[in-house]
Amino acid sequence: MAGKKGCRLRTIAYTKTFKKDYQRMAASGRYDMALVNQVGGLLIAHTAQQVLSAQWSDHALIADDEWDAGDRDIHLGGDFLLIYRIDPHPEAKDMEIVIFKRLGTHGDLFG
């Protein structure tokens, strides 16, 4: 099992809050939930940060009471946001874990 040269393999994990957010957003019928899977695939594939920044407005969040250092924000379209982070895998030294933390609108996540 090898990732791109010099890259660690990645896996995805979901917080309990993210799972609830996902169900709520999917049930509303107003958001393209396939975009969540698409971005997850890009993150696992080590897509260059420049590509994510250009297409999805990927950027770091400022650490505060709500968000931790290392948390990032991707704009999936309009007012549809994904908060995630990438950490070393807790059990496998040669892997990273992409953690989907929250999903929602600006009002849901920052208001």
Give the residues covered by each predicted segment.
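Acidic, metal-associated active-site segment
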Residues: 84
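Basic, Lys/Arg-enriched alpha-helical interface segments
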Residues: 1-78, 87-97, 101-111
